[in-house]
Curated annotation (Swiss-Prot):
Transmembrane segments: none annotated. One of its GO terms (biological process) is lipid transport. Coiled coil: none annotated. Pfam families: Tryp_alpha_amyl. Plant non-specific lipid-transfer proteins transfer phospholipids as well as galactolipids across membranes. May play a role in wax or cutin deposition in the cell walls of expanding epidermal cells and certain secretory tissues. Keywords: Allergen, Disulfide bond, Lipid-binding, Transport. PROSITE patterns: PLANT_LTP. The lineage of its organism: Eukaryota, Viridiplantae, Streptophyta, Embryophyta, Tracheophyta. This is Non-specific lipid-transfer protein 1.
Length: 91
């Protein structure tokens, strides 16, 4: 999995993580796609690192909104989407 794949899948989520409100269906589809692409521990760690980079590079991200995304979409992501997540511990 590449950061390009992660960022293109999660582009529809940017307005939600900045401003809240309803999560767009395209955003949930993107989270599902990333989760399905990240099948191995190495892929999950790579996706985690990409998410950390993305959340740090987008101004105005609300960390609570970012962390709530998987639950709001009904997707089980095995780590918290947060700039402080230690991706090395992701299994």
């Amino acid at each position: 999995i590449t950061c390009g794949q992660v960022s293109s899948n999660l582009a529809p989520c940017i307005n939600y993580v900045k401003g809240g409100g309803a999560v767009p269906p395209a955003c949930c589809n993107g989270i599902r796609n990333v989760n399905n692409l990240a099948r191995t521990t190495a892929d999950r760690r790579a996706a985690c690192n990409c998410l950390k980079q993305l959340s740090g590079s987008i101004p105005g991200v609300n960390p609570n909104n970012a962390a709530a995304l998987p639950g709001k979409c009904g997707v089980n992501v095995p780590y918290k989407i947060s700039a402080s997540t230690n991706c090395a511990t992701v299994k």
